[in-house]
A protein has these predicted regions:
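Localized chelating/binding microdomains
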Residues: 31, 52, 124, 128, ...
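Adenine-nucleotide phosphate-binding core of ATP-dependent small-molecule kinases
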Residues: 67-75, 104-134
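Short glycine-rich phosphate-binding loop at a beta-alpha junction
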Residues: 16-20, 29, 133, 137-149
Length: 170
């Protein structure tokens, strides 16, 4: 959601004076599992900040879309759309992520390559945790069980297969 969808809502933009817009409001908008981040995003102080950002942005119409997410409490739907795109990318090379609940024509194409790029850092953290577990256990597992959304992710399966060759992934 953050890397592929938030630029549609003005993330990475600048003010009229050429100053980069702060990233935190966009990050907090999609951090749906982080209660403090969501509290901050939906706070009245953030609402005032979003008003200021819309006023000062070089592309105010994009930032106004983030403001709509704030006003209508659309974070979960936004992240759900990203999740649906991620699921689709487990079986196709490219998918269209549409956000009609924000704006009728708001959409972007997301590719497996784009997803891979967006997941590089989180995937590296997952693999670090796997290595830590292996180091602590001092032995390799007989089988790897993936659950939840990760069970469908070819990226995670591939990375684990490279880290633990010869161990079946279920």
């Amino acid at each position: 959601a953050f890397k592929n969808l938030m630029p549609l809502l003005g993330m990475g933009g600048e003010t009229e004076k050429g100053i980069a817009l702060p990233i935190l409001p966009w990050w907090n908008a999609v951090a749906i599992n982080d209660v403090p981040a969501q509290s901050d995003f939906y706070s009245s102080a953030n609402g005032r900040l979003l008003n200021d950002l819309v006023r000062d942005a070089r592309e105010p119409e994009k930032v106004a879309l983030l403001q709509k997410v704030w006003r209508q409490r659309l974070s979960y739907r936004l992240v759900r759309s990203a999740e649906e795109s991620k699921i689709a990318l487990s079986s196709v090379a490219e998918t269209r992520a549409s956000l009609p609940f924000i704006s009728d024509e708001l959409a972007t194409l997301i590719s497996q390559q784009g997803l891979e790029s967006a997941l590089n850092q989180p995937l590296a953290r997952i693999l670090e945790q796997v290595q830590l577990a292996l180091d602590n256990a001092q032995e390799k597992p007989d089988v790897i069980y993936l659950t939840g959304g990760s069970a469908r992710s070819p990226l995670i399966k591939k990375a684990l297969a490279e880290q633990l060759p010869g161990i079946p992934i279920a």
